Amino acid sequence: MKESHVSGRHSIVQFEGRPERLSCETGALLLREADERLGLSRDLARVVEDKRDPSRVVHSMEELLRTAIMLPALGWRDQDDADFLRWDAAVRLAISDRRGISALLNSDKTEAKGLGSQPTLCRLHEGLSSDRNRSVLREFLMESAARRLKAGNGGHRQRYVTIDIDSLPIEVDGSQPGAEYNGHYDAEIFHPLIATAAELGDILDVKLRPGSVHTAEGGLEFILNVVRTAEKSLCQVAAVRMDAGFPDEETLQGLESQGVPYVARIKNNAVFDAMAEPYLTRPRGRPPTEGRTWTCEMSYQVQSWSRARRLVLIITENPRELFLNHFWLVTSWTEDEKHAEELLSCYRQRGTAEGVFGELMDSIEPALSSNRRPKSHYRGQTIPHRSGKNLSFAVNEARLILAALAFNLAHAVRCVAEKAFQKGLTIKGLQEKIFKVAARVTLHARRINIILASDVCERWLTLWSKINCLGFANGRA
């Protein structure tokens, strides 16, 4: 036992260090329960290609995947954090393959193994960076959303899902392969594509791209793949919603040829401004004290388009501004299928995707910092390997997909918490108010006691029972 005394004006504070099993991240147990119900780490470990020598394996692939997914979900973004939390009792209980007391104590009463170290996680990310493993990670990213949906929907797919497509700047430090200066964001960034499900709030797919690419580069292939996969496991019909950077002829024609409904904003230019000019007049009468919006329908063929398409002019009035504002939407829906007001309402719900992007960057904070400098020789022999630049980029993409999986797992717990407590909750709030709970772990002959403060214990028991009742078992609702 270590003691330290600090004298103050009115009292003496004493600090003691005791060999007890304590934790500041008890929320890892909630994530493990949700992960068990989803079957995420278990099923993912079965299909990921593991090229390690079995005779030298200390941590199973399932344990390493749990570590790589749960730590970001708890708010720990760096690989070094695994060393800091290596002996945290609750985190070890949550991540270990062993059940019960054996997760913390060996049969000879010695302390069981801790979490995988930072070098171990580096090797994991490198192993997951192969083309096959990244494809598997992507499939399970979509599958995680599908399983959560079916758990609350009687095992059925949803009838209709809107997929939001956008790019996201991720700033990096140092010289990372693929990170390039982007003048629009005035920073060194990666510029990945991200697809989210508007009605669900889950991330469906991500694709890492160099920082200087245009917003729409590689967009069509990415979108069609997401839609194809979503309609197999998530919904019967998937529609696409895009921002102004995506609707070029290739993308629109590709979506129409596959029968995928879409709505997208179009960038204003001199031609569109001239077309809108006759409609930018206020209606007769006294201006209202609140803003108002009206729409105009037309069909028009842009010079770069192969045919005319339905355009909707959106005009907005702000009482505090002298001039009217306007923007344009293009859509594949006919007026009978979705009239202008419905279309505008649909597009404005794109704010849910912006919220997902913000939460991903604020709460999970993907750390894309792999810059491999591989050895060229070992004991006089040349080592065959992929180029360091290409491998580092692939490792960063694998880390981004794992961050998205961490977001979906935390989101699954967040959705249960919102229903249990009847109030909204952000991922950051979930991490700070529910996950970061101090606890003492005590071991008895046949059980483990998690001792929480009395004011949080009741809330925790409610949330635990709700997660445990979800129909995630064996990956089926």
Annotate each PLM feature.
Residues 1-16, 261-365, 468, 472-477:
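An anionic, glycine-rich sequence signature occurring as long contiguous blocks
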Residues 1-233, 255-258, 438-477:
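Dynamic "connector" segments at or just before major functional cores
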Residues 34, 82, 340-391, 398, ...:
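Short amphipathic alpha-helical "interface-anchor" segments enriched in bulky aromatics
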Residues 54-63, 319-320, 390-400:
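Structural motif
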Residues 83-85, 98-101, 238, 417-427:
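Short, glycine/acidic-rich hinge or "gate" loops at secondary-structure transitions
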Residues 241-248, 268-270:
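Acidic, metal-coordinating catalytic cores used for nucleic-acid/nucleotide bond scission
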Residues 382-396, 410, 414-477:
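C-terminal, non-catalytic "cap/extension" segments appended to globular domains
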